[in-house]
From Swiss-Prot:
Name of the encoding gene: sodB
Keyword Ubl conjugation appears in the UniProt entry: yes
Entry GO CC: cytosol; extracellular region; periplasmic space; plasma membrane
Cofactor(s) of this protein: Fe(3+)
Function: Destroys superoxide anion radicals which are normally produced within the cells and which are toxic to biological systems.
Organism: Mycobacterium tuberculosis (strain ATCC 25618 / H37Rv)
Entry note: cofactor: Binds 1 Fe(3+) cation per subunit.
Protein's UniProt name: Superoxide dismutase [Fe]
Enzyme class: oxidoreductase
Length: 207
């Protein structure tokens, strides 16, 4: 059975400075993300053992652990692709039009996304996703890595608001981190995800 693996980054750890420090990116990728990858692989192995023993309490526990760690792995894999040293500015083309249609303007979208990020209670994410059932863009607060994000929503843009993503540089002023994020958003990646979500997910929920 194939194992989950830690992805390589498209840029050096220090490439997002001064907006996100190299120290944060190195720890975030090589330690925190790596821990979720290991946790997901460990949960899969323990699930196999529990199923062989027909130990349903252990099965449920490890399914829960897998959901948490695999979601952490998935979210971070998107997170790294959503960032670029050549990022910033605004989206263009179909994504820009869809954002304006859904939120009224890019500035209104940005304000709503910023509010979602900075008011997360505890650990979580802000997420822009494509609703494959309603055919529209939506913003969600994601609690931990997987809660409050409905099935059928395709993540396009994520902002990690766990303290490990910003505390070494921004301390408790997470609002400044959320503002700095816009300087390194890789809109080309978000546009690519939007194009795939709107063209390849029809019938995903209801055939």
């Amino acid at each position: 059975m194939a194992e989950y693996t830690l992805p390589d980054l498209d840029w050096d750890y220090g490439a997002l400075e001064p907006h996100i420090s190299g120290q944060i990116n190195e720890l975030h990728h090589s330690k925190h993300h790596a821990t979720y990858v290991k946790g997901a692989n460990d949960a899969v192995a323990k699930l196999e053992e529990a199923r062989a023993k027909e130990d349903h309490s252990a099965i449920l526990l490890n399914e829960k652990n897998l959901a948490f760690n695999l979601a952490g792995h998935v979210n971070h894999t998107i997170w790294w692709k959503n960032l670029s040293p050549n990022g910033g500015d605004k989206p263009t083309g179909e994504l820009a039009a869809a954002i304006a249609d859904a939120f009224g303007s890019f500035d209104k979208f940005r304000a709503q996304f910023h509010a979602a990020a900075t008011t997360v209670q505890g650990s979580g994410w802000a997420a822009l996703g494509w609703d494959t059932l309603g055919n529209k863009l939506l913003i969600f607060q994601v609690y931990d890595h997987q809660t409050n994000f409905p099935l059928g929503i395709v993540p396009l843009l994520l902002l990690d608001m766990w303290e490990h993503a910003f505390y070494l540089q921004y301390k408790n002023v997470k609002v400044d981190f959320a503002k700095a994020f816009w300087n390194v958003v890789n809109w080309a990646d978000v546009q690519s995800r939007y194009a795939a979500a709107t063209s390849q997910t029809k019938g995903l929920i209801f055939g």
